[in-house]
Amino acid sequence: MYNLRNRSFLNLLDFTSKDIKYLLDLSINLKKSKYAGIEVQKLKGKNIVIIFEKDSTRTRCAFEIAAYDQGANITYLGSKGNQMGSKESMIDTARVLGRMYDAIGFRGFSQQTVECLANYSNVPVYNGLTDISHPTQILADLMTIKEHKGSLKGIKIVFCGDGRGNVANSLLKGCAIMGLDFRIFAPKELFPDPDLTLKARSLALESGGKITITDSKEEAVKCADVVYTDVWVSMGESNWEDRINLLKAYQVNKEIMCMAKDDAIFMHCLPAFHDLNTVIGKDIFDKYGLDGIEVTEEIFESKNSVVFDVAENRVHTIKAIMVSTLG
């Protein structure tokens, strides 16, 4: 049986299209089994720890539910629940946790940290988000596209907003590996790193995909099957005025969706600022009069929106990673 036993999941560039296809197929099968009430627990007796330097709703819940569904035990360590980097080095922490646990999940500020955990723990380590990478999110994105469009090959997907962010970077990698026609619609100041773009174009050449980085709305959005965006400012940051002035022309709204295909789906990794029901959303409306920030309420709540399918699929894809590396 094809598996990824004992592999860490740190960066999509570590995996082939065959690896990712296997994980997506396994995710879909695990989802079907759960819905049918016939899921087989393959992780009984396994112990998993998840370390969160940055808070999250979806990522924490997805890891915990995935583990519980498969019979594993899980420990959560929040930003105030460990000594990592303060009273104990990251290397020593990795060694300790590797003796106690069968796998480690990490969500935090630095890619170097998750790689350190993988290098010194000697158990599989899963990247739940770092400053430059969000690979578990992209698995859920690709699974959702496959569910709604039937296939990934040739799908045209446009990311609108900050082309340098971890989600845009990871989409760039994943779409290049899997042969999608991926476009980033962003201001020139926020184009992705040129070296990463070069690598992605090389991968796309092998997979039959295509990579376009542009500040032209028509070039990016025309005939898109999928329109994707992310928040403009990371949680805890406050430079909204500069970001809004730079990115307001890249908001996903009715004009954008009308340029895409009629059956185009809208995706967002969440959380999203689309209404006035958050402190930040209300504050931005009062200051700038924006109807939503990165996406309007009209589009977020439209029939084209599959954002909650994506959120649910975080569970199934993370579960697939656990099963394939530990089962």
Swiss-Prot record:
InterPro entries to which the protein is assigned, alphabetical: Asp/Orn_carbamoyltranf_P-bd, Asp/Orn_carbamoylTrfase, Asp/Orn_carbamoylTrfase_sf, Asp_carbamoyltransf_Asp/Orn-bd, Orn/put_carbamltrans, OTCase_ArgI
Subcellular location: Cytoplasm
Keyword tRNA-binding belongs to the record: no
Binding site for L-ornithine: N166, D230, S234, M235
Catalytic reaction list: carbamoyl phosphate + L-ornithine = L-citrulline + phosphate + H(+)
Pathway assigned to this chain's UniProt record: Amino-acid degradation; L-arginine degradation via ADI pathway; carbamoyl phosphate from L-arginine: step 2/2
Source organism, top-level taxon: Bacteria
Top class in the EC scheme: transferase
Keywords: Arginine metabolism, Cytoplasm, Transferase
Stated role: Reversibly catalyzes the transfer of the carbamoyl group from carbamoyl phosphate (CP) to the N(epsilon) atom of ornithine (ORN) to produce L-citrulline.
Family, similarity comment: Belongs to the aspartate/ornithine carbamoyltransferase superfamily. OTCase family.
Protein name: Ornithine carbamoyltransferase, catabolic
Annotated organism of origin: Borreliella burgdorferi (strain ATCC 35210 / DSM 4680 / CIP 102532 / B31) (Borrelia burgdorferi)
